[in-house]
């Protein structure tokens, strides 16, 4: 550790000052971890992704709108973010669950760290979770809603969780689509293809 490196010192400070957080499943099961991004509470149906790379594409994928994303990849954040790799105009997941979250990143064309990106997008995440154990659990028990939170009143969190609607049958396309027409590519091209944006 080099105390003269201000960037490293800042990242180390953020790592050591993380707050305790919990992952609460709809059946009452609790997993303990550390918070990333904003404090507070985030909720949604818990789902998981086993991809080894491409976390930024996953977080901005409209098909995951409103879900708590559990990443089974052991390291999240280690190559930062690049705005050219987003799948939509903003993060679409409601929160992130991961094992190891990296405040340091190493990539030539990275534009920022993932934790700074989360803070700008007002996203909450929880790390230090045994993600493989959670995947095995929800794979056996089935899809369910969940909450991640820095709050400590479990009974109050259970009440909030009970009020979260089931995603089955929810109309979500309008929340990730656009209200205006727009172009990809050359507007003067000879051949044109029309597409209905339900979350491109």
Language-model features: where?
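N-terminal beta1-alpha1 cap of cysteine-dependent amidohydrolase-like domains
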Residues: 13-200
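Short, positively charged and aromatic/hydrophobic N-terminal segments
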Residues: 2-4, 9
């Amino acid at each position: 550790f080099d105390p003269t490196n201000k960037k490293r010192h800042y990242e180390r400070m953020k790592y050591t000052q993380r707050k305790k957080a919990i992952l609460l499943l709809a059946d009452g099961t609790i997993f303990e971890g550390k918070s990333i991004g904003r404090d507070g509470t985030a909720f949604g149906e818990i789902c998981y992704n086993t991809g080894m790379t491409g976390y930024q594409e996953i977080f901005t994928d409209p098909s995951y709108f409103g879900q708590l994303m559990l990443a089974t990849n052991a390291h999240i954040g280690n190559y930062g973010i690049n705005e050219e790799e987003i799948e939509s105009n903003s993060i679409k997941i409601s929160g992130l669950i991961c094992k190891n979250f990296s405040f340091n990143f190493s990539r030539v064309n990275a534009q920022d760290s993932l934790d700074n990106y989360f803070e700008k997008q007002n996203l909450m995440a929880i790390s230090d979770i045994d993600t493989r154990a959670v995947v095995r659990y929800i794979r056996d028990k089935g899809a369910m809603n969940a909450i991640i939170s820095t709050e400590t009143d479990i009974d109050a969190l259970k009440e909030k969780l009970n009020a979260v609607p089931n995603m089955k049958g929810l109309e979500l396309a309008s929340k990730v689509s656009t209200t205006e027409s727009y172009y990809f590519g050359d507007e003067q091209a000879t051949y044109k293809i029309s597409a209905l944006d339900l979350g491109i």
